[in-house]
């Protein structure tokens, strides 16, 4: 039926939005984590300001960000993407910087003692240690964002949550049930795939 096709398309849009938001946040957080880490960046004031900025972003709930972006850019998936991106930057930035801080300093110091450049130290001494952690955490947040997608849709940030809300208001209970089942299936598939990928990365 048309409603099934529409829900499927909206579900696909939700997956694309969530994955894009998480992917962009990951790209932004990698350089942020280096600047916020005492292993790489020695200017304490800059590190302090960046960490407080990340604390502020992380301290505002994703629902509040969604309302702000819906007001600024109107209804639709773009507001949802920005909400996911903003919250993920705050949280992943903190997690990435902590992972960088906890990297084995002996390997980094060993390369520095040989006169290696800062870029070489990061490329060969640091990234091999932290890259699996970054990927694992990013996948987990993509999985978590899929669950948040329904809430984002309720406030008008697009996605399958908006379709669910509209059908509940219209009392189309058969279509409501179909969308709920679709959400459960999508979450189960993404959870399973993410868990398998993260397990393989950690095992390696």
Residue ranges and their predicted role:
Residues 22, 26-30, 34, 63, ...:
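Hydrophobic positions within alpha-helical transmembrane segments of bacterial inner-membrane proteins
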Residues 136, 177-204:
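C-terminal transmembrane helix and the adjacent membrane-cytosol boundary/short C-terminal tail
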Residues 48-58, 98-113, 124, 166-170, ...:
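Short amphipathic alpha-helical coupling elements at transmembrane boundaries
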């Amino acid at each position: 039926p048309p409603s099934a096709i529409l829900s499927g398309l909206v579900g696909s849009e939700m997956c694309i939005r969530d994955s894009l938001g998480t992917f962009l946040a990951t790209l932004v957080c990698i350089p942020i984590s280096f600047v916020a880490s005492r292993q790489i960046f020695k200017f304490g004031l800059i590190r302090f300001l960046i960490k407080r900025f990340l604390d502020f972003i992380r301290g505002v709930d994703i629902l509040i960000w969604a309302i702000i972006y819906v007001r600024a850019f109107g209804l639709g998936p773009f507001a949802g993407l920005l909400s996911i991106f903003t919250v993920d930057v705050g949280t992943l930035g903190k997690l990435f910087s902590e992972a960088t801080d906890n990297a084995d300093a002996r390997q980094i110091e060993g390369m520095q003692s040989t006169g290696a450049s800062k870029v070489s130290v990061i490329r060969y001494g640091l990234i091999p240690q932290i890259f699996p952690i970054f990927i694992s955490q990013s996948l987990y947040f993509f999985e978590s964002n899929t669950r948040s997608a329904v809430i984002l849709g309720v406030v008008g940030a697009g996605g399958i949550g908006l379709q669910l809300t509209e059908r509940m208001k219209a009392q189309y209970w058969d279509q409501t049930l179909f969308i709920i089942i679709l959400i459960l299936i999508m979450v189960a598939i993404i959870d399973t795939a993410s868990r398998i990928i993260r397990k393989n990365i950690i095992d390696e």
